């Protein structure tokens, strides 16, 4: 059984947390995040720590307790340090380039795929085959990286496509001729 909800969240220096009913605003050096949580879950802020409390021990409240704590911890981490997800492109002629805030992908199609950067998300293209998605919201960074990967996910025969750095792509053997 998970006890993540019982862990205390430490607020680092330079980060402020405001609770207004069920809405929580977290401000830090990298930006500001606002999110609404279930009104049954209560947040207690004392000095530089946040404690998440649940009203009872029903299954639903236990689930919400852990989820709320994890989301809140990610908000605090995001506004203080930020999040990033690195992707690599493998394949002949597979390229990425920035045009303003837009990411332009050449991934073996008859046209180029353009990915517009969502709010609070930044793309970094160090080399034509590497992409880094940066932002303060862990959810938005992961979702954007997954969308970029979906433009050409790695195929199992040659391993070509866009993959996360360090991702293992399971390979298949090709057909055997007579």
From Swiss-Prot:
**SUPFAM superfamilies assigned:** Ribosomal protein L6 (SSF56053)
Q: Which domain of life is it from?
A: Bacteria
Listed A to Z, the keywords are:
Ribonucleoprotein, Ribosomal protein, RNA-binding, rRNA-binding
> From the UniProt record, which GO molecular function terms apply?
rRNA binding; structural constituent of ribosome
Per the record, what is one GO cellular component?
A: cytosolic large ribosomal subunit
Q: What PROSITE patterns is this protein classified in?
A: RIBOSOMAL_L6_1 (PS00525)
**What sections of the sequence does the record tag as coiled-coil?**
none
State any GO BP term from the record: cytoplasmic translation
What does the similarity note say? Answer: Belongs to the universal ribosomal protein uL6 family.
Cite the record's note on assembly: Part of the 50S ribosomal subunit.
Against HAMAP family, the record matches this protein to: Ribosomal_uL6_B
Q: What does this protein do?
A: This protein binds to the 23S rRNA, and is important in its secondary structure. It is located near the subunit interface in the base of the L7/L12 stalk, and near the tRNA binding site of the peptidyltransferase center.
Q: What is this protein called?
A: Large ribosomal subunit protein uL6
Source organism (scientific name): Lactococcus lactis subsp. cremoris (strain SK11)
Please state the gene responsible for encoding this protein: rplF
């Amino acid at each position: 059984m998970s006890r993540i909800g019982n862990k205390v969240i430490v607020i680092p220096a330079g980060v402020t947390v405001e609770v207004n009913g069920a809405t929580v605003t977290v401000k830090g050096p990298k930006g500001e995040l606002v999110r609404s949580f279930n009104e049954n879950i209560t947040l207690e802020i004392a000095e530089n720590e946040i404690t998440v409390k649940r009203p009872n021990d029903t299954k639903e409240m236990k689930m919400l307790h852990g989820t709320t704590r994890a989301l809140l911890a990610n908000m605090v981490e995001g506004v203080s340090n930020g999040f990033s997800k690195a992707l690599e492109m493998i394949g002949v002629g597979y390229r990425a380039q920035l045009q303003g805030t837009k990411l332009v992908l050449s991934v073996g199609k008859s046209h180029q795929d353009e990915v517009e950067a969502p709010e609070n998300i930044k793309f970094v293209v160090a080399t034509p085959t590497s992409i880094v998605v940066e932002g303060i919201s862990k959810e938005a960074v992961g979702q954007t990286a997954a969308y970029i990967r979906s433009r050409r996910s790695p195929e199992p025969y040659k391993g070509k496509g866009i993959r996360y750095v360090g991702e293992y792509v399971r390979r298949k053997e090709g057909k055997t001729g007579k």
